[in-house]
């Protein structure tokens, strides 16, 4: 693997170990030329996924792009990064298990919303404001009401 610091073509693996409950291999690498150390992750990719955007354009699924969009929603929130990584991995597994070669971007947005709802209400609202294209304050009010109703429904089930 190429060194990200000096671009030398050959680096050495110093340590390999399973991560994310065995779904990923984490490798620590070192460059023999500049001594730079870095980590890589190896994941199974079941199939190449294509994402159909709202405008009809297709593009390859990009896990990093998904991670960046979730990172924006959780920015400055006290959320364990491992929890976010697990959520992203779960979303990717769900997408791969659909068995469809093309997936609508709306489906991904829905899966992210469901994942964030279980992690952090503020991150959920932030993501929803972009995903649902909020135009005014009443859109925020509606999603907060939706969240509050969901919490009240959950609490009433525990009271029974």
From Swiss-Prot:
<dbReference type="GO" id="GO:0005524">
    <property type="term" value="F:ATP binding"/>
</dbReference>
<dbReference type="GO" id="GO:0003677">
    <property type="term" value="F:DNA binding"/>
</dbReference>
<keyword id="KW-0479">Metal-binding</keyword>
<dbReference type="GO" id="GO:0045892">
    <property type="term" value="P:negative regulation of DNA-templated transcription"/>
</dbReference>
<protein>
    <recommendedName>
        <fullName>Transcriptional repressor NrdR</fullName>
    </recommendedName>
</protein>
<keyword id="KW-0238">DNA-binding</keyword>
<dbReference type="Pfam" id="PF22811">
    <property type="entry name" value="Zn_ribbon_NrdR"/>
</dbReference>
<comment type="function">
    <text>Negatively regulates transcription of bacterial ribonucleotide reductase nrd genes and operons by binding to NrdR-boxes.</text>
</comment>
<keyword id="KW-0804">Transcription</keyword>
<dbReference type="GO" id="GO:0008270">
    <property type="term" value="F:zinc ion binding"/>
</dbReference>
<dbReference type="InterPro" id="IPR003796">
    <property type="entry name" value="RNR_NrdR-like"/>
</dbReference>
<dbReference type="InterPro" id="IPR005144">
    <property type="entry name" value="ATP-cone_dom"/>
</dbReference>
<feature type="domain" description="ATP-cone">
    <location>
        <begin position="49"/>
        <end position="139"/>
    </location>
</feature>
<keyword id="KW-0805">Transcription regulation</keyword>
<dbReference type="InterPro" id="IPR055173">
    <property type="entry name" value="NrdR-like_N"/>
</dbReference>
<keyword id="KW-0863">Zinc-finger</keyword>
<feature type="zinc finger region">
    <location>
        <begin position="3"/>
        <end position="34"/>
    </location>
</feature>
<keyword id="KW-0067">ATP-binding</keyword>
<dbReference type="Pfam" id="PF03477">
    <property type="entry name" value="ATP-cone"/>
</dbReference>
<comment type="similarity">
    <text>Belongs to the NrdR family.</text>
</comment>
<keyword id="KW-0678">Repressor</keyword>
<keyword id="KW-0862">Zinc</keyword>
<keyword id="KW-0547">Nucleotide-binding</keyword>
């Amino acid at each position: 693997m190429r060194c990200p610091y000096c671009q030398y073509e050959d680096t050495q693996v110093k340590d390999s170990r399973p991560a994310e409950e065995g779904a990923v291999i984490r490798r620590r690498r070192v460059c023999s030329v500049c001594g730079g150390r870095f980590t890589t992750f190896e994941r199974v990719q079941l199939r190449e996924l294509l994402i159909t955007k709202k405008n009809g354009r297709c593009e390859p699924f990009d896990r990093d792009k998904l991670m960046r969009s979730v990172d924006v929603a959780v920015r400055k929130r006290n959320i364990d990064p491992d929890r976010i990584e697990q959520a992203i991995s779960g979303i990717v597994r769900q997408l791969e298990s659909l068995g469809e070669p093309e997936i609508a971007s709306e489906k991904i947005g829905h899966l992210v919303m469901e994942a964030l709802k279980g992690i952090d209400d503020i991150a959920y609202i932030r993501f929803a404001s972009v995903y649902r294209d909020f135009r005014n304050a009443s859109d925020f009010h509606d999603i907060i009401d939706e969240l509050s109703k969901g919490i009240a429904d959950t609490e009433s089930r525990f009271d029974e």
